[in-house]
Swiss-Prot record:
Disulfide bonds: none annotated. GO terms for cellular component: small ribosomal subunit. This is Small ribosomal subunit protein uS7. One of the primary rRNA binding proteins, it binds directly to 16S rRNA where it nucleates assembly of the head domain of the 30S subunit. Is located at the subunit interface close to the decoding center, probably blocks exit of the E-site tRNA. GO terms for molecular function: rRNA binding; structural constituent of ribosome; tRNA binding. Keywords: Ribonucleoprotein, Ribosomal protein, RNA-binding, rRNA-binding, tRNA-binding. It comes from the Bacteria. One of its GO terms (biological process) is translation. Belongs to the universal ribosomal protein uS7 family. PROSITE patterns: RIBOSOMAL_S7.
Length: 156
């Protein structure tokens, strides 16, 4: 990793149906091997199911799910005098969003429903209602940070 220049931020085009940049990032994270149309089909299909089940705007359910999954604090390893400490640090906004997206997708892929569309819709609904594996992951992260609060003075 070069120390001279940080990578330029690429402009992300909002998705066609809802005009949301975060949703495009979500689709890009779901995408395998450059198959964007498949990723779009999965996300829009899941949004249709969410709309039918929750009787709510799917983009609002999506945003609520992301907010409920995004961690506020995490632990990072810090080596001090031969010992490695897990130091709690606040999470930057971009990383919060990236982690929330990653955890939602991992939790959806880990479910036992038939299709990815069903799995994703179920995980989105669960996360919006503060349930599910993605929310559990965030709570575990917060618990870890709370347990290591004694080392917070090693923050950098």
């Amino acid at each position: 990793m070069s120390r001279r220049h940080s990578a330029e931020k690429r402009e992300i085009i909002p998705d066609a149906k809802y005009g949301d940049v975060v949703l495009t990032k979500f689709m890009n994270s779901i995408m395998y091997e450059g198959k964007k149309s498949t990723a779009e089909r999965i996300v829009y299909g899941a949004f249709d199911i969410v709309e039918n089940r929750a009787r709510a705007n799917p983009i609002e359910v999506f945003r609520a799910a992301l907010d409920n999954v995004a961690p506020a604090i995490e632990v990072r390893s810090r080596r001090v005098g031969g010992a490695t400490y897990q130091v709690p640090v606040e999470v930057r906004t971009e990383r919060r969003q990236a982690l929330a997206i990653r955890w939602l997708i991992q939790a959806a892929r880990g479910r036992n429903d038939r299709t990815m569309i069903e799995r994703l819709s179920a995980e989105l609904l669960d996360a919006a209602n503060n349930r599910g594996n993605a929310v559990k992951k965030r709570e575990d992260t917060h618990r870890m940070a709370e347990a290591n609060r004694a080392f917070s003075h090693y923050r950098w």
